[in-house]
Amino acid sequence: MPPSGLRLLPLLLPLLWLLVLTPGRPAAGLSTCKTIDMELVKRKRIEAIRGQILSKLRLASPPSQGEVPPGPLPEAVLALYNSTRAQVAGESAETEPEPEADYYAKEVTRVLMVEKENEIYKTVETGSHSIYMFFNTSELRAAVPDPMLLSRAELRLLRLKLSVEQHVELYQKYSNNSWRYLSNRLLTPSDSPEWLSFDVTGVVRQWLSQGGAMEGFRLSAHCSCDSKDNTLRVGINGFSSSRRGDLATIDGMNRPFLLLMATPLERAQQLHSSRHRRALDTNYCFSSTEKNCCVRQLYIDFRKDLGWKWIHEPKGYHANFCLGPCPYIWSLDTQYSKVLALYNQHNPGASAAPCCVPQVLEPLPIVYYVGRKPKVEQLSNMIVRSCKCS
């Protein structure tokens, strides 16, 4: 007698033949998804977190809650907890590079400082304390039409040989003729010229977004309270008027400039579309009608949901979880996926499709008591920030 699988084969062959003749269409036509009980999913997630916390703390069971002392935490413990929280917040706030923008080659453009003969230089006070560098923003916009395409901007200065050490400061010009401090540099003596570079990406991106015609920087000697001499002793190429002829031309070409690195304009629409899709995913993740793999909000109150009083800080946190289908491509050249769908119909416990899983996880700092002793711990991978199909 043939095995049961072979007995079913004659019944499946007509259906498989029909699938082969069917044009590619969405997987929803043969969806076997059942209605999801969100409350059940949340309860399972809460119980998983209960075990996760105990496991990470190497505790077989929750500590005794009768010995937790009343009142506020000791000052040293609270300071340690707050500093740990600040560190985690700082790390999570760091902007992650976008894969699309990082992939494409960057166009590099050099925009020279406006020549000293321009009328704009008459609007600032001249003296031995500072030098001024102005840039035509129309040239910047011609190089980078969209501020979001700018990857990096550097102010490059060719300093001449320097016989004494000097501390210099860089400032940005504001519209009301005030100056905003940006950065500083300690310059050491040198017998040869040397290029100086300042990261001014944020400033240039701001200029590209505004409508000003001329924007500028100021390089000044550091004003020391211990010294009355605030002369800018470092020489910057392009500010010397003693050169003539070819040497003056070379000086002019090496005068201060902005080095711009930006994604090519032809990629702008593609990057905008991908950002728009990511923004929609972020918004829709918390909608009850969302059907894709995404982050679902879940706040866990330690006392209410877990019945724990031994975790003193925080009182709860957004653990979140990933949920949603991960459809795979159905087309004439991937008909095997339809066979897998039939397989799943007859084997509901198995899964050959990709799953919705966490992509970015963040740690959770806590203060808890073991007996009457408070401890600060950082639990890794406790907060789901984004999901992916894998």
Curated annotation (Swiss-Prot):
Disulfide bonds join 285-294, 293-356, 322-387, 326-389. One of its GO terms (molecular function) is type I transforming growth factor beta receptor binding. Glycans are attached at residues 82, 136, 176. InterPro entries: Cystine-knot_cytokine, TGF-b_C, TGF-b_propeptide, TGF-beta, TGF-beta-rel, TGFb1, TGFb_CS. The record marks 278-279 as: Cleavage. Residues 75-271 are annotated as: Arm domain. The keyword Protein biosynthesis does not apply. Keywords: Cleavage on pair of basic residues, Disulfide bond, Extracellular matrix, Glycoprotein, Growth factor, Mitogen, Secreted, Signal. One of its GO terms (cellular component) is blood microparticle. Transforming growth factor beta-1 proprotein: The precursor proprotein is cleaved in the Golgi apparatus by FURIN to form Transforming growth factor beta-1 (TGF-beta-1) and Latency-associated peptide (LAP) chains, which remain non-covalently linked, rendering TGF-beta-1 inactive. Pfam families: TGF_beta, TGFb_propeptide. Residues 1-29 form the signal peptide. A motif (Cell attachment site) lies at residues 244-246. Residues 226-252 are annotated as: Bowtie tail. GO terms for biological process: ATP biosynthetic process; cell-cell junction organization; cellular response to transforming growth factor beta stimulus; chondrocyte differentiation; epithelial to mesenchymal transition; extracellular matrix assembly; extrinsic apoptotic signaling pathway; hematopoietic progenitor cell differentiation. It comes from the Eukaryota. Transforming growth factor beta-1 proprotein: Precursor of the Latency-associated peptide (LAP) and Transforming growth factor beta-1 (TGF-beta-1) chains, which constitute the regulatory and active subunit of TGF-beta-1, respectively. Homodimer; disulfide-linked. Interacts with the serine proteases, HTRA1 and HTRA3: the interaction with either inhibits TGFB1-mediated signaling and the HTRA protease activity is required for this inhibition. May interact with THSD4; this interaction may lead to sequestration by FBN1 microfibril assembly and attenuation of TGFB signaling. Interacts with CD109, DPT and ASPN. Interacts with EFEMP2. Interacts with TSKU; the interaction contributes to regulation of the hair cycle. Interacts with TGFBR3. Belongs to the TGF-beta family. PANTHER family: TGF-BETA FAMILY, TRANSFORMING GROWTH FACTOR BETA-1 PROPROTEIN. This is Transforming growth factor beta-1 proprotein.
